[in-house]
A protein has these predicted regions:
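Immediate post-signal peptide segment of exported/extracytoplasmic ligand-binding proteins
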Residues: 27-50, 85-88, 192-200
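C-terminal region of N-terminal signal peptides and the immediate post-cleavage residues
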Residues: 15-32
Length: 446
C-alpha cells in the first residue's frame, strides 16, 4: 500500500471569489442579529477549523503533512490579511493515522469542537455518518461542513455536505447503476495527439487497494477513449513493487514499440518505470505521461537524467510562476517558500480559500454573527466558478465546487534539464479550460 497512496492524488487531478465581488478576507461588519458564538467552533474572536489527515503512521510517516502545512499556511495568510468574519482562524490538526477508526474518532471530535473540516485527507474515511449526523449548537442535525483535499471512498465523494475542490470522477447519481458514469480529464491527451499522430501504449495502475484500482481505472479508460490505443491490458502492480517488477512492463513497451506510457501511481512508480525501461533499451516512447504526483522535487532529485522529458499535467498554476499569479505567490510566502510546498499543500491552500469565500458570502448576507454551519452549507452549494483567487488572480480555472463537477482546466509541464518547464498553454500564468478537456465514460466497478 505504501507507494500506491500517491495514486489517489494522481486520479483526483487528471487541483476567487465566486459570488461576492471581493477576493480577500471580508471586512468586519456590524449587522444586527445573531450571536458572536453563532455555532460550534465560533467565538467572538476565533473560528476553529479541523484538518484531519493521515500523518503519523508506520506505513509512510509524514504522509499528508503537506495537507496540514497548506491549511496552516491559509490560516496564517488570513490572520495577517484582515481576518475572516472579524475573527482569527484557528487550525486544529487531528491525525487519522491511516485508520478508519481514527478517522471516525477525528470527525466526532471535530463535530464537538470545530466549525468545519478543511483539507480533509484521510484515506480510510469510509464512514460519513458522524459527519452527516453531526448536530449544531442548537441541536439540529445540520452536519459538519467539509472542504476536503482528497476523497477516496464513494460515500465521502457523494456526501452533500462535502465540497471537494477536486471533484470525484464518479457521477454520484449513477452510483447504483450498472454501469456507473465517470468523468475523465483528457486535455493533455488531446495535446499529445496533436503532436504525435499515432499514440499507443501501456498504463500501470496500483493494485494494493480496491479504491486505488477503482479510482485509476476511469483515468486510463478516459485516455483510451480520447484516442491512445492499448497495447496491453492495464498493468496492476503493487505500490511496494521494486524496479525489477517493472521488467514485464518495459518488455511489453519494447515488444510493441509503444509510443505512450503512464503510471497512475505515486512518483516512485514512474521512476521505476523510467529506469527499468532505460535498462531494457526502450527508445520508442514519445510521451512519458504523468500528473501531479510527478510534480515533486523528489522526483527530479531521485530521477536525474532518467526522467528527462517526463510530462506532468497540473490543474493549478505552477509554483515556478509565482510572479505571474498572486494566489501562488501568497501560498508560497505563507508556507515558507517553494522548498516547503508540494501538491498536497497546494490543494489544501485552495480548500482554505474556498472556505474563506463561503464564509465571506455568509457574512455579506447575514453579518459577522450570522455564521452557522447550516448557512455555510447553503452558501457553499451556490459557488459554481471558484478559482482560488488572491488579489483577483485565480490559482485554478473556474470550478463548479457547489455542484461537485470535475474541472478540465490544466497546464502541461515537462522535465527539461532537471526543471519543470511549461509546455502548454504557452503563456505563463494561464490554464487551458477547453470544454473538450473532460469526457464521460461508463464502467461497472461494483
Amino acid at each position: 500500500m505504501k507507494r500506491s497512496l500517491w495514486a489517489l492524488v494522481a486520479v483526483a487531478v487528471g487541483i476567487g471569489w465566486a459570488v461576492s465581488p471581493a477576493a480577500g478576507a471580508a471586512p468586519a461588519q456590524n449587522q444586527p442579529g445573531g450571536s458572536p458564538n453563532s455555532d460550534i467552533g465560533v467565538t467572538a474572536d476565533t473560528i476553529r477549523i479541523a484538518v484531519i489527515a493521515d500523518v503519523d503512521n508506520p506505513v509512510q510517516p509524514g504522509l499528508f503533512q503537506g495537507t496540514v502545512n497548506g491549511v496552516q499556511a491559509f490560516a496564517k495568510y488570513i490572520n495577517g490579511h484582515g481576518k475572516l468574519a472579524g475573527r482569527n482562524v484557528q487550525v486544529d490538526f487531528i491525525d487519522s493515522h491511516l485508520s478508519a477508526d481514527e478517522a471516525r474518532n477525528a470527525v466526532i471530535r471535530a463535530c464537538q469542537e470545530d466549525f468545519a473540516m478543511v483539507g480533509t485527507n484521510a484515506l480510510f474515511f469510509n464512514n460519513v455518518q458522524p459527519m452527516e449526523q453531526c448536530v449544531d449548537q442548537v441541536g439540529q442535525m445540520t452536519g459538519l461542513p467539509d472542504v476536503p483535499t482528497l476523497q477516496t471512498e464513494t460515500p465521502h465523494q457523494c456526501s452533500q455536505i462535502s465540497f471537494a475542490i477536486i471533484a470525484a470522477a464518479i457521477d454520484c447519481a449513477t452510483v447504483n447503476d450498472h454501469p456507473q458514469t465517470y468523468s475523465a480529464r483528457v486535455g493533455q491527451i488531446l495535446y499529445y495527439k496533436k503532436q504525435n499522430k499515432d499514440l499507443h501504449g501501456i498504463w500501470v495502475l496500483p493494485s494494493d487497494l480496491k479504491s486505488t484500482i477503482n479510482s485509476t481505472t476511469p483515468v486510463a479508460t478516459g485516455d483510451t477513449k480520447a484516442g491512445v490505443k492499448q497495447d496491453q491490458d492495464f498493468f496492476k502492480i503493487s505500490g511496494l513493487a521494486t524496479q525489477s517488477d517493472y521488467t514485464p512492463v518495459a518488455a511489453t513497451i519494447k515488444q510493441h514499440n509503444s509510443t505512450y506510457a503512464q503510471s497512475i501511481s505515486d512518483y516512485k512508480s514512474s521512476l521505476n518505470l523510467r529506469k527499468e525501461s532505460k535498462i531494457q533499451g526502450v527508445s520508442s516512447v514519445k510521451v512519458w505521461d504523468c500528473a501531479l504526483q510527478c510534480y515533486d522535487a523528489k522526483f527530479l532529485s531521485q530521477g536525474g537524467a532518467d526522467v528527462d522529458g517526463q510530462y506532468a499535467s497540473l490543474f493549478f498554476i505552477p509554483f515556478e510562476e509565482a510572479k505571474q499569479n498572486k494566489s501562488v505567490d501568497a501560498f508560497l510566502t505563507a508556507i515558507g517558500g517553494k522548498g516547503k510546498a508540494d501538491g498536497f499543500a497546494a490543494q489544501a491552500w485552495t480548500a482554505g480559500l474556498f472556505f474563506r469565500d463561503v464564509v465571506n458570502n455568509v457574512v455579506k448576507a447575514d453579518g459577522n454573527n450570522g455564521l452557522t454551519r447550516a448557512r455555510f452549507i447553503e452558501e457553499a452549494r451556490k459557488i459554481h466558478d471558484f478559482t482560488a483567487a488572491v488579489g483577483g488572480q485565480g490559482m485554478l480555472g473556474p470550478t463548479d465546487v457547489g455542484a461537485h463537477k470535475l474541472n478540465g482546466c490544466f497546464v502541461l509541464t515537462q522535465v527539461k534539464g532537471g526543471k519543470y518547464v511549461r509546455v502548454f498553454p504557452k503563456e505563463k500564468g494561464t490554464l487551458n479550460c477547453d470544454s473538450k478537456n473532460v469526457t464521460t465514460i461508463k464502467l461497472d466497478q461494483t
